[in-house]
A protein has these predicted regions:
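Short, basic (Lys/Arg/His-rich) helix/loop patches that form interaction surfaces
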Residues: 24-30, 124-165
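Long, amphipathic, Lys/Arg-enriched alpha-helical "connector/arm" segment
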Residues: 3-34
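Catalytic-site neighborhood detector that most strongly recognizes the C-terminal catalytic loop/helix
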Residues: 5, 70-74, 167-192
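Short pre-functional
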Residues: 36-49, 152
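Active-site/catalytic core of tyrosine-dependent DNA strand-transfer enzymes
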Residues: 13-20, 82-137
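Short, polar N-cap/turn motifs at the start of nucleic acid-interacting alpha helices
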Residues: 59-67, 136-138, 158-177
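Conserved tyrosine-mediated DNA breakage-rejoining catalytic core shared by Y-recombinases
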Residues: 1-2, 55-91
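DNA/chromatin major-groove-contacting recognition/catalytic segments
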Residues: 78-83, 87, 91-92, 180-200
Length: 200
């Protein structure tokens, strides 16, 4: 039922502070830098999924916007293109001249699907190692970037309907499941503010 799904997603977001720590890590290897930068790219693009990032093509950038269709839902999303995104693209140039980032290669022997699967496993494995270098108690995966964007937007008082649209969710219900991870402390703090308004 819905309840088990929400408990599953309960610890899948990290704070802005932790993301800043991740961004500032001095990393030794290409694999580590690549995994970290893709995590950040996902966060900067409102939690874009790994599959969608891998499949982006240069033609998806038009007139200052990144315009793409979510593979999962077919929904079209437009994201204002920012320097932070361009910097990451510049670091990992296309392998085949067609894709935006150097993740998939049209000319390689392996199918794009096999390449995608292999890359995703490698990136998540690397992110797992990076989890230990920053101050968090969960394991980083590409999925955490998506959850973190939703949660951090909510903490900035962005309405759920806007978050839902931003992420290309089919319904606000999906977004609510993402946001269940907002912790009890925050709810208590909010309640304190409401109580204090009456009692103080």
């Amino acid at each position: 039922g819905a309840f088990t799904r929400t408990t599953k997603t309960s610890k899948r977001a990290i704070s802005q502070k932790a993301i800043r720590q991740l961004a500032q890590l001095k990393l030794e290897t290409y694999n580590q830098q690549f995994a970290r930068d893709l995590f950040l790219f996902s966060y900067y693009t409102r939690g874009m999924s790994f599959v969608d990032i891998a499949c982006l093509e240069k033609s998806n950038i038009r007139n200052g916007y990144l315009i793409y269709k979510r593979r999962k839902t077919g929904q079209e999303l437009r994201i204002a293109w920012r320097q932070s995104m361009q910097d990451i693209v510049d670091r990992y140039p296309s392998l085949d001249g067609k894709h935006l980032l150097g993740i998939l290669d049209n000319h390689a022997e392996k199918s794009l699907r096999q390449q995608r699967h292999y890359r995703q496993c490698l990136i998540n494995k690397t992110l797992k190692k990076l989890s230990k270098l920053i101050d968090i108690d969960i394991t980083l995966t590409m999925y955490v970037a998506r959850h973190s964007w939703a949660t951090n937007a909510k903490e900035k008082n962005v309405p759920v309907s806007v978050i839902s649209d931003s992420m290309g969710h089919n319904s606000e219900k999906t977004t609510q499941i993402y946001l269940k991870s907002i912790n009890a402390d925050q709810i208590d703090q909010t309640n304190d503010i409401l109580i204090d308004a009456i009692t103080k």
